[in-house]
């Protein structure tokens, strides 16, 4: 949803903004009918902005860190949107979560078959796109941060802020923590540099 009611797993926060979001919400509501009586474990995870290894196939839908890394490689600079809707240049925020942490959350539920329901899978802390860009530029040790006009086609349709309410996940017992974003950016950039972002068994 837009986030005007927060980003918890409660119905009051579930306002699909497009057909893709509606399809996911439709399936969540379908699954909710079976949580209480299902013989097998049923868990739905709502992933926030995931980034990390092996997302090359996603093209334009790959994470911003992946795109920024490749922008720098091609042009020696990173591009972000100018400010809009009360946000400064590059100050739009997202709850970015490292894919390694997503894996930890998945294994947490694997280890706790008694748990069921729909859970947010985010860090609970939003970071700006500027934070990402500066992390990528810091990795390379040089480069320019350029702000480009906010696209007219996105006005009124763009989420300028997301931040998972992780209280339900933490209350369920997840205590695996989340990787510091600056540390994760540096680690991911190093992997992109070395293996084009792929995890390769070098034994």
Task: Explain the meaning of each model-derived region.
Residues 1-44, 56, 60:
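Catalytic helix-loop patch of NAD(P)-dependent Rossmann-fold dehydrogenases
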Residues 3, 23, 54, 90-92, ...:
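Gly/Ser/Thr-rich beta-alpha loop segments that engage phosphate groups in nucleotides
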Residues 10-11, 69-70, 110:
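Short secondary-structure boundary/capping segments
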Residues 17, 46-48, 122:
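Active-site beta-alpha turn of Rossmann-fold NAD(P)-dependent dehydrogenases/reductases
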Residues 50-52, 102:
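Conserved sequence/active-site signature of Rossmann-fold short-chain dehydrogenase/reductase
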Residues 72-203:
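C-terminal substrate-binding subdomain of Rossmann-fold SDR/epimerase-dehydratase oxidoreductases
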């Amino acid at each position: 949803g837009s986030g005007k009611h927060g980003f918890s797993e409660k119905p009051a926060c579930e306002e699909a903004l497009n057909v893709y979001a509606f399809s996911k919400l439709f399936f969540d509501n379908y699954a909710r009918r079976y949580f209480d009586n299902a013989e097998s474990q049923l868990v739905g995870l709502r992933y926030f902005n995931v980034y990390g290894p092996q997302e090359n196939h996603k093209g334009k839908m790959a994470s911003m860190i992946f795109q920024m890394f490749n922008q720098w490689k091609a042009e020696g600079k990173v591009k972000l949107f100018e400010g809009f809707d009360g946000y400064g240049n590059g100050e739009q925020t997202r709850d970015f979560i490292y894919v390694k942490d997503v894996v930890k959350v998945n294994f947490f539920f694997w280890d706790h078959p008694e748990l069921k329901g729909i859970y947010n899978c985010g860090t609970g802390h939003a970071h700006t796109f500027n934070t990402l860009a500066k992390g990528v530029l810091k990795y390379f040790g040089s480069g320019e941060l350029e702000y480009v006009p906010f696209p007219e086609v996105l006005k009124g349709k763009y989420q300028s802020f997301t931040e998972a309410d992780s209280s339900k996940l933490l209350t369920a017992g997840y205590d695996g923590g989340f990787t510091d974003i600056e540390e994760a950016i540096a680690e991911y950039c190093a992997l992109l540099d070395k293996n084009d972002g792929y995890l390769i068994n070098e034994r």
